[in-house]
UniProtKB/Swiss-Prot annotation:
Enzyme active site: D154, H227, S560
Domain Inhibitor I9: 36-120
Record-linked Pfam families: fn3_6, Inhibitor_I9, PA, Peptidase_S8
Residues bearing attached sugar chains per UniProt: N165, N394, N663, N731
Subcellular location: Secreted
Annotated CDD domains: PA_subtilisin_like, Peptidases_S8_3
Provenance organism: Arabidopsis thaliana (Mouse-ear cress)
Swiss-Prot/TrEMBL GO biological process terms: proteolysis
An example Gene Ontology molecular-function term: serine-type endopeptidase activity
Gene, per the UniProt record: SBT1.3
Protein's recorded name: Subtilisin-like protease SBT1.3
Keywords, comma-separated and alphabetical: Autocatalytic cleavage, Glycoprotein, Hydrolase, Protease, Secreted, Serine protease, Signal, Zymogen
Highest classification ranks of the organism: Eukaryota, Viridiplantae, Streptophyta, Embryophyta, Tracheophyta
Entries under InterPro entries matching the protein: PA_domain, Peptidase_S8/S53_dom, Peptidase_S8/S53_dom_sf, Peptidase_S8_Ser-AS, Peptidase_S8_subtilisin-rel, Peptidases_S8_3, S8pro/Inhibitor_I9, S8pro/Inhibitor_I9_sf
Signal peptide feature range: 1-25
Length: 780
């Protein structure tokens, strides 16, 4: 059809031209916008004219930014950090175009964009057996205990807490190279023989978010958030009698390694934690001389060569530092783990045998069990019924109103009533605040399918009880179908001896480790639900700004809480065995872990009450008493970890980010099978090729028990494969002697799902258990 409007084509051309101009402007803006990149360098490639690495790094930045005007900014202002201990490199602000050019430069191994990380947010020592009579040998006072320094990367520390009292501690070892940095409300005297180091890292954070508002948080090691104080006290807090939260969990609070020392590295702020700051803290902590690093945060999963934390902790491991990280709070979804590198000990969360019971009584019909940490001025008489309301559409499918989001509740419908709120979307305590502001007098917090029957107690601002999914559905159904629904709430205090326990926490992130199915993750479980530990004096226990309450101890849940349990036990082991490598300590923790609860039944999963698998609990639940004397260990050195990386289809340049030492090369000692890494867990992965019917994996154990000892092997039966171990007996004649064995898997028929079991070496005094996983990939 002919064009009848002579203006149509020119007008269309103008519109298209304008769109192209905007598109080009937007693209140009994206390319020219600076952000932080972590640049990994090959230090051995530094040319002779340069006298130091900083000079060389500056020239590299200059080479890609030299077209910028001097008025715009100096190149040295682009550099935020340099890294020289755990790994070699720098963090700098670059545009996308500059970063791409820099990656082409000689000596530059990798240029990785800044990553934002998130925090993974008394009774536990007793539950772990560290207060039984036989535990005296573990907590018996030794000078070597005082020599272990645990670096805690978190939100800082509240030094006035009684948990950081240094009474009875020996002088700080001369080998310690750390420092106490001063700043707002943090002086040199805030450090002592317990807190031996305190540093802050914020350049990456400020580059990404702008200057820190010092009216809202301290630009110093002082902790306003509370998370860092809680984790540091869990690792190595001194004993404090009468510790409690509003009378709940009353008892003696103490860290796992109560005589170890703490160095606080503040890397997390109101807006999160940034990789350039975290890496600088790891680098500095290793230079300071820490023996253990406790890192309760995560930032998703990247390939090994693009994961800056993985690269930095590889360097820490090379320097003999044990690294413990939280698995994440992404459970119960599968493949939700973070921090999956084999040289990192990845910790999931479990419950303990302590609870904070509360009840919800609906009408005169029945009573439902729940939990609560509420203690406040408002008390609802337990014998009085109050109107009960649920504003969701149905009992099974939560909606925006049922989540009690801010502004979603109408005072006309909730004033003077107990309100039912579904768990999820917003923090649990915030829901109670929303109910209170709308005039509600109480809250029933109901789990959804995601959380199942797992109960997490909170210090709410109004009377509130949390209940499981099944109970929640019944309570909601009653509220929706009864014309005059009523309920009463009763808070019952603290109860111990809960069965079954431990149970895998529903929120604890799950495997498998999709980067490397041959490496089991998480590695193990530790207590992470309702943990009492020290707290900041600047934040309410609910972490709500409107909450005026202040406490010395708080109860928190998360893999953030389980990680420092393992870090503390690792410090105990290090103090008893100072010559052990990080891998030996990890092996001791994993091979002594248990997989049955206090009812002698297999560990279960709180999200569904079904038995858990190694993808949920790893090698099992930590057992500190046995971990200090494991009998045998599976040791792994830096070169063998590097050999593992050689099996991961990484290019020579990608492998280079892990080689501080230029002479480290692939020797292919694992026969191109990552399952041959001398890991304490054994994973056989049959490929898509159905012609592969058999597979043999090799392990080597080191005797750290009696000089003369004999171990016999036993293996769980599997449906889809036969498993043969050779030899069946290991006879040791000296301490530190190494012996090897092979495990051969022969497929009977390919199973659609992985099979789980265990391999145990047993002597008259020790039992050394490794989880075994057999996986058949679907045929092509």
């Amino acid at each position: 059809m002919a064009n009848k409007n002579p203006l149509q084509k020119p007008f269309l051309f103008i519109i298209l031209s304008i769109n192209l101009i905007f598109l080009q402007a937007e693209t140009t803006t994206q390319i020219s916008t600076k952000k932080t990149y972590v640049i990994h360098m090959d230090k051995s490639a530094m040319p002779l004219p340069y006298t130091n690495h900083l000079q060389w790094y500056s020239s590299k930045i200059n080479s890609v930014t030299q077209h910028k005007s001097q008025e715009e900014e100096g190149n040295n202002n682009r550099i935020l950090y340099t890294y020289q201990t755990a790994f070699h490199g720098l963090a700098a602000q670059l545009t996308q175009e500059e970063a791409e050019r820099l990656e082409e430069e000689d000596g530059v191994v990798a240029v990785i964009p800044e990553t934002r990380y998130e925090l993974h947010t008394t009774r536990s020592p007793t539950f772990l057996g560290l207060e039984r009579q036989e535990s005296e040998r573990v907590w018996a006072e030794r000078v070597t205990d005082h020599d272990v320094v645990v670096g805690v990367l978190d939100t800082g520390i509240w030094p006035e807490s009684e948990s950081f009292n240094d009474t009875g501690m020996s002088p700080v070892p001369a080998t310690w190279r750390g420092a106490c940095e001063t700043g707002k409300r943090f002086l040199k005297r805030n450090c002592n023989r317990k807190i031996v180091g305190a540093r802050v890292f914020y350049r990456g954070y400020e580059a990404a978010t702008g200057k820190i508002d010092e009216e809202l948080e301290y630009k110093s090691p002082r902790d306003r958030d509370g998370h860092g104080t809680h984790t540091a006290a869990t690792v190595a807090g001194s004993p404090v009698k009468g510790a409690n939260l509003f009378g709940f969990a009353y008892g003696t609070a103490r860290g796992m390694a109560q005589k170890a020392r703490v160095a606080a590295y503040k890397v997390c702020w109101v807006g999160g934690c940034f990789s350039s700051d975290i890496l600088s803290a790891v680098d500095q902590a290793v230079a300071d001389g820490v023996q253990v690093l406790s890192i309760s945060l995560g930032g998703g999963v990247s390939t090994y060569s693009r994961d800056s934390l993985s690269i930095a902790t590889f360097g820490a491991m090379e320097m003999g530092v044990f690294v413990s990280c939280s698995a994440g709070n992404g459970g119960p979804d599968p493949i939700s783990l973070t921090n999956v590198s084999p040289w990192i000990t990845t910790v999931g969360a479990s419950t303990m045998d302590r609870d904070f019971p509360a009840t919800v009584k609906i009408g005169t019909m029945r009573t439902f069990k729940g939990v609560s940490l509420y203690k406040g001025r408002t008390v609802l008489p337990k014998n009085k019924q109050y109107p009960l309301v649920y504003l969701g559409r149905n009992a099974s499918s939560p909606d925006p109103t049922s989540f009690c989001l801010d502004g979603a509740l109408d005072r006309r419908h909730v004033a003077g009533k107990i309100v039912i709120c579904d768990r999820g979307v917003t923090p649990r305590v915030q829901k109670g605040q929303v109910v209170k502001r709308a005039g509600g007098i109480g809250m029933v917090l109901t789990n959804t399918a995601t959380n199942g029957e797992e109960l997490v107690a909170d210090s709410h601002m109004l009377p509130a009880v949390a209940v499981g999914e099944k109970e929640g559905k019944l309570i909601k159904q009653y509220a929706m179908t009864s014309k005059k629904a009523t309920a009463s709430l009763e808070i019952l205090g603290t109860r111990i001896g809960i069965k079954p326990s431990p149970v895998v926490a529903a929120f604890s992130s799950r495997g498998p480790n999709f980067l490397s199915l041959e490496i089991l993750k998480p590695d193990l479980l530790a207590p992470g639900v309702n943990i009492l530990a020290a707290w900041t004096g600047d934040m309410a226990p609910s972490s709500l700004s409107s909450d005026p309450r202040r406490v010395k101890f708080n109860i928190l849940s998360g893999t953030s809480m389980s990680c420092p349990h393992v870090s503390g036990v690792a410090a105990l082991i290090k103090s008893r065995h100072p010559d052990w490598s990080p891998a030996a300590i990890k092996s001791a923790l994993m091979t002594t872990a248990y997989v049955h609860d206090n009812m002698f039944k297999p560990l279960t999963d709180a999200s569904g009450a079904a038995p858990s698998s190694p993808y949920d609990h790893g090698a099992g639940h930590i057992d500190p008493l046995r971990a200090t004397d494991p009998g045998l260990v599976y040791d792994i050195g830096p070169q063998e970890y590097f050999e593992f990386l050689c099996t991961q289809d990484l290019s020579p340049s990608q492998l280079k980010v892990f080689t501080k030492h230029s002479n480290r090369t692939c020797k292919h000692t694992l026969a191109k099978n990552p399952g041959n890494l001398n890991y304490p867990a054994i994973s056989a992965l049959f490929p898509e090729n159905t012609h592969v019917k058999a597979m043999t994996l090799r392990r080597t154990v080191t005797n750290v028990g009696p000089h003369i000892s004999s171990y016999k092997v036993s293996v769980s039966p599997f449906k889809g494969a036969s498993v043969t171990v050779q030899p069946k007996t290991l006879n040791f004649t000296s301490k530190h002697q190494k012996l090897s064995y092979t495990v051969t898997f022969r497929t009977r028929f390919r199973m659609k799902r992985p099979e789980f079991g265990g391999l145990v070496w047993k002597s008259t005094t020790h039992k050394v258990r490794s989880p075994v996983i057999i996986t058949w990939l679907p045929p092509l």
